Amino acid sequence: MKKYLIPTLLLAVFEAVAVSLWLGKGNIFYLLNFSYIGISLALGVFLFLRGVPQARRVSQLLVGTYMLGYLGILCRENMQLEGFWYYLFSGSFTAATIHYAVAKIFGPLVFGRGWCGYACWTAMVLDFLPYKTSPGPRKSFGWIRYIVFAASFLFVAALFLLGIQNKEAILFWAFLLGNSLYYAVGIFLSFRLHDNRAFCKYICPITVFLKPMSYFSLFRVKCDHSKCVSCGKCKKVCPMEVDVTDNSRRRKKRHGVHSVHGMREKLPQKGTVMQKSSTAQGQHGKDPLHAKAPSG
């Protein structure tokens, strides 16, 4: 039962957030919203531990369609970066500000880039494309994400500085157009570079938040060198081109949890695990790659 510690803790964290916001703001929506997301994410991790091949995709579809379709389109909440800046400038700790605080700013201290692999509605679509692994080394234009990040900030700042009316209506259309552009660019890059995750690597501005926080992640993928046969296959099949055999926090191209799932069916040995970063003990199950908390 110890291997189910991670989904249990994940659900507990989201339930704590759900109850706290419900009681603090007096709005039952927060209880239902974060409970649903927590259950969906925990379910995906649980199914993964049970060896279900499409486990991560279950969480992606449950959370991604809910946030894009229900919150974004039906409720007209801009859950993109522009929505975060808008509510932040408005002094309102609701909607996108809470979402970013939980999923992309403070949450990564616990689950790293789990957002990218389990909940992102952009990656949800891109992961259906045929190029699971990159055919070559990373390109040198990852700096584009910083331009996108800055453009998002300046766009919302201009709405306030220029006194533009109907900001929420503008942001709703920005949400629709922005997501359409993200999908178009993501699909184009996937086919152009033969890499489903090209958008994530070079364009997505969210990594500006995720990268520094996930560096200190409580749970992270580590290699048990006593099991590793140094075949190098994990590096070749990892969708985010991570040097999985390097347990250092400074290893190149630190990753999201989806890297584990991209490799799980392709390795000859059970040498890579997800565990608390404070320990390096190998914990092994029946899958080549699996998420299991340490005993210590």
Model-inferred region functions:
Residues 1-246, 255-258, 262-265, 270-295:
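Non-ligating segments of multi-cofactor redox enzymes
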